[in-house]
C-alpha cells in the first residue's frame, strides 16, 4: 500500500474474511430488459438503463462542493440530489425521529443537465433515506457523499456526515463513495479533483464494490490537477482530538449556565506511517480508503468464545 497506484482489484475478500468464499461483488443496479415493441418503449427503456446516481452532502445544499460534484458526475447518468437545507457537519450516521420535509430546490447554474434537486430538513442520512423512499424511481446504481469542504481522513471519518451518506448507501445495498477536498474555504477550487472524481465513479459504476464496502476519497488542496502526485490506496491513520472543549467567555444562557464550544486540534499518532491516508494527503497524494460497515472485531471472536464458555487457552480480555 506504500506505493502509488491506480485502482487495484476491489473484488478481493476483506482481509478479516475467513470463510471459504469471497465476499460477493456488488454490481451497479440495472433495470430488467423487457421485449421492446415501439419507439416510445425503446426510448423509455434507454432512459431506465441510464445509471441512477443519488448525491447528498453534509455542508448543505447551497455549498459549492455539491454543485461541483453534480457538474462532474451528471454526464455519467441521471442524478437525484437530496441534501440538507443547511450545514449538518459532524452528524455521522445520525437520523431523525422528528418530522421531516422535502422541498424542491432550484438547480444552481452550471450544475449539469439531467438532475433533480431536493432539500431536506434532516441529517445527511435522513436525506438518503428520504430519497430512497420518495424520490428514486428505482434502486440507484451509485450513492455519493460530498464533495466535502475539508478532509474526512483518519479517525475523523467516524464523525463525518459525508461518510454517513456512503455508509447508509452500503447498508441499502448500493455501491457508495464519499469525496472530500482538503480545503475549508466556501469558495474552494474543486476543478483539480474533477478527473479523479470521474475515474472513481466510472470504476464503481462499471465494476461495483465488495458487499458492505464503500470508498472514502480524500484529495489534497492543489493549484492544478498536475500538482496531485498520484493516487494511493491507504488505511485509516490513527489519531485524536486534544483540548476539545473551550469556554466561551461571558456567554451565559438564560438559565445561568456557562456555554462551551468544541474546538481543539487534531494529532496524527503515526505521522511516519507511509501506508496511511494522513501521510498520503500530507505528501500530495489522493487517498482512497476502502471502509466497511462490518464493525466486527474478528480477531476477538475466538478469545471471547473462550471467555463465555470457560474454555480455551486464553480467557483474558487484555
Residue ranges with predicted function:
Residues 191-318:
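Electrostatically charged, flexible surface regions
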Residues 32-47:
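Short, Lys/Arg-enriched N-terminal segments with co-localized hydrophobic residues
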Amino acid at each position: 500500500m506504500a506505493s502509488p497506484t491506480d485502482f487495484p482489484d476491489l473484488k478481493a475478500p476483506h482481509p478479516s474474511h475467513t470463510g471459504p468464499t469471497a465476499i460477493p461483488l456488488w454490481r451497479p443496479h440495472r433495470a430488467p430488459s423487457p421485449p421492446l415493441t415501439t419507439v416510445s418503449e425503446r426510448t423509455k427503456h434507454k432512459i431506465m438503463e441510464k445509471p441512477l446516481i443519488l448525491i447528498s452532502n453534509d455542508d448543505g445544499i447551497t455549498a459549492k462542493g455539491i454543485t461541483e460534484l453534480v457538474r462532474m458526475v451528471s454526464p455519467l447518468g441521471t442524478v437525484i440530489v437530496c441534501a440538507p437545507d443547511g450545514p449538518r457537519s459532524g452528524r455521522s450516521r445520525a437520523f431523525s425521529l422528528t418530522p421531516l420535509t422535502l422541498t424542491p430546490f432550484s438547480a444552481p447554474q452550471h450544475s449539469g443537465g439531467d438532475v433533480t434537486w431536493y432539500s431536506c430538513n434532516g441529517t445527511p442520512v435522513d436525506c438518503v433515506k428520504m430519497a430512497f423512499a420518495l424520490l428514486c424511481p428505482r434502486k440507484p446504481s451509485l450513492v455519493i457523499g460530498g464533495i466535502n469542504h475539508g478532509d474526512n481522513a483518519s479517525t475523523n471519518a467516524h464523525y463525518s456526515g459525508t461518510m454517513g451518506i456512503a455508509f447508509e448507501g452500503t447498508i441499502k445495498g448500493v455501491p457508495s463513495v464519499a469525496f472530500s477536498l482538503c480545503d475549508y474555504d466556501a469558495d474552494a477550487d474543486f476543478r483539480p479533483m474533477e478527473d479523479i472524481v470521474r475515474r472513481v465513479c466510472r470504476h464503481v459504476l462499471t465494476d461495483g464494490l465488495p458487499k458492505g464496502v464503500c470508498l472514502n476519497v480524500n484529495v489534497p488542496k492543489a493549484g492544478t490537477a498536475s500538482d496531485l502526485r498520484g493516487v494511493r490506496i491507504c488505511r485509516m491513520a490513527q489519531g485524536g482530538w486534544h483540548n476539545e472543549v473551550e469556554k466561551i467567555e461571558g456567554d451565559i444562557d438564560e438559565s445561568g449556565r456557562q456555554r462551551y464550544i468544541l474546538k481543539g486540534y487534531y494529532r496524527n499518532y503515526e505521522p511516519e506511517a507511509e501506508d496511511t491516508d494522513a501521510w498520503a494527503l500530507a505528501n500530495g497524494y489522493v487517498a482512497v480508503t476502502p471502509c466497511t460497515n462490518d464493525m466486527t472485531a474478528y480477531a476477538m471472536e475466538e478469545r471471547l468464545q473462550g471467555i463465555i464458555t470457560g474454555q480455551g487457552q486464553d480467557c483474558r480480555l487484555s
